[in-house]
Amino acid sequence: MSSTEPAAAAAGLAIPALGYGAANVGNLFRALSDDEAWAVLEAAWDAGIRYYDTAPHYGLGLSEKRLGAFLQTKPRDEFVVSTKAGRLLRPNPERRPSGLDTDNDFHVPDDLRREWDFTEQGIRASIAESQERLGLDRIDLLYLHDPERHDLDLALASAFPALEKVRAEGVVKAIGIGSMVSDALTRAVREADLDLIMVAGRYTLLEQPAATEVLPACAENATGIVAASVFNSGLLAQSEPKRDGRYEYGQLPDELWDRLVRIAAICRNHDVPLPAAAIQFPLQSALVRSVVVGGSRPAQLTQNAEYAALEIPAGLWAELAEARLIPTP
């Protein structure tokens, strides 16, 4: 696959098949200097990546600011940018001297806090504030960010209709939901009029719970999918799995470890790096428009783009399917 070739179009929006998830330039897990963050983004651009995903949540706005500063140096029609709504950034009255937002894994000052707001006014404010931080004339794609963490019913009654309204007005080109909860994704697809959904860690080479209900719902409603967190917390990021790897911030269950070992062995038999298979697996489904990967070092972006472009033999997918490690096409 080519990272610069649109995999499909949604709402008139061509989504490149490989995207960069910009949480790391918002100081996720470790602090980056402005120069280090710029180098990461430059590496992504040089590797041909033209889809960039961010959110106010990422570094309390730092990701949007850094990404926007970088993208302002590039031709606007040459990239797609998505951000998210549902939480507004407001002054934090409980800010601690020298305090950091490490409770949310971001190494940034905690001078702001996130406030849920699913009203139309809140959605419009979120868009305006994101545009200001990004410094861009428009946002291509807007996701509602993890609404089930607050109130999914309220989101369906208020936030999604607001997203549909701003799309109809041309404020954004396409709308969706970003979540790692299959039930929330399925309900949103069935009860709202969405163009794309971002499925985080639920349709990966290691496990595919989204295949049961989310993908069928998307097929029924002509909704595209952007697959994120495809490395399963890093478990698939190296060709040789590690038993002490973390799974969703906890210990890796024995059952998943056994699956991981079997998948890695089949990849070795076909001379395919495990991370390459992890990046390309979601795109074996015609519903998946793009795969978004992260990274906090330039070399990671360069390598991921190479993995995305690697030619993988059909026999690999056939053997994985025969072993019932991935769904049968």
Swiss-Prot record:
Keyword vocabulary terms for this entry:
NAD, NADP, Oxidoreductase
Reactions accelerated catalytically? a D-threo-aldose + NAD(+) = a D-threo-aldono-1,5-lactone + NADH + H(+)
Recorded GO terms, molecular function? D-threo-aldose 1-dehydrogenase activity
**Thermal activity characteristics from the UniProt entry:** Optimum temperature is 37-40 degrees Celsius. Activity decreases at 50 degrees Celsius.
| EC number annotated for this UniProt entry | 1.1.1.122
Q: Where does substrate bind?
A: 145
Q: Which Gene3D superfamilies match?
A: NADP-dependent oxidoreductase domain
Matching InterPro entries, A to Z?
AKR (IPR020471), FDH-like (IPR044477), NADP_OxRdtase_dom (IPR023210), NADP_OxRdtase_dom_sf (IPR036812)
- Activity regulation (record text): Inhibited strongly by Hg(2+), Cd(2+) and para-chloromercuribenzoic acid (PCMB) and weakly by Zn(2+) and iodoacetamide. Also inhibited strongly by L-xylose but not D-glucose.
Q: Which residues form the active site?
A: 58
Provide the Gene Ontology terms for cellular component.
Answer: cytosol
pH dependence of this protein's activity = Optimum pH is 9-10.5.
The family database entries (PANTHER family) matched by this protein are listed as: GH17980P-RELATED (PTHR42686:SF1)
Q: Which family does it belong to?
A: Belongs to the aldo/keto reductase family.
Q: What does this protein do?
A: Catalyzes the oxidation of L-fucose to L-fuconolactone in the presence of NADP(+). Also active against L-galactose and, to a much lesser degree, D-arabinose. Uses NADP(+) as a hydrogen acceptor much more efficiently than NAD(+).
Record's protein name: D-threo-aldose 1-dehydrogenase
Q: Which organism is it from?
A: Pseudomonas sp
